[in-house]
UniProtKB/Swiss-Prot annotation:
Coiled coil, from the record: none
MF terms (GO), sorted A to Z: actin filament binding
Protein name: Actin-related protein 2/3 complex subunit 5-like protein
Subunit details: May be a component of the Arp2/3 complex in which it may replace ARPC5.
Superkingdom assignment: Eukaryota
Organism: Homo sapiens
The protein's role, per its UniProt record: May function as component of the Arp2/3 complex which is involved in regulation of actin polymerization and together with an activating nucleation-promoting factor (NPF) mediates the formation of branched actin networks.
Length: 153
């Protein structure tokens, strides 16, 4: 028993690695921000110019920055998604929403509610149309999951 208590193996664990308040160098943070996930704005713009709305929609929702704390990345992704949503024709919205799985509908709802937080000149009317179609596909559960989720977009 004395042999186990004198063991120093527990000292090899770096407990500061798990601390949220740990100091992070700004240069490391900037390098991590450059590698942050998010939709590629040039790819989405190219698809919008070609008129391929459905592929632009899926490209905008792909690699969403849910796990990052960098607000600049999140706002850039929100702008890209809002640009795609406002370019859709109202007759094509239902088809786009139905092409998503449950997690995709929840992610779309997160972006819709984020768009409601900061409305622009015509975005509220468009977002209400998207909300109607997403609610029809995802049900009330998608709203509850979005409002209770800890990870935001």
């Amino acid at each position: 028993m004395a042999r186990n208590t004198l063991s120093s193996r527990f000292r090899r664990v770096d407990i500061d690695e798990f601390d949220e308040n740990k100091f992070v160098d700004e240069q490391e943070e900037a390098a991590a921000a450059a590698a942050e996930p998010g939709p590629d704005p040039s790819e989405v713009d190219g698809l919008l110019r070609q008129g391929d709305m459905l592929r632009a929609f899926h490209a905008a929702l792909r690699n969403s920055p849910v796990n990052t704390k960098n607000q600049a990345v999140k706002e850039r992704a929100q702008g890209v998604v809002l640009k795609v949503l406002t370019n859709f024709k109202s007759s094509e919205i239902e088809q786009a929403v139905q092409s998503l799985d449950r997690n995709g509908v929840d992610l779309l709802m997160k972006y819709i509610y984020k768009g409601f937080e900061k409305p622009t000149e015509n975005s509220s009317a468009v977002l209400l149309q998207w909300h109607e179609k997403a609610l029809a596909v995802g049900g009330l559960g998608s709203i509850i999951r979005v409002l209770t989720a800890r990870k935001t977009v």
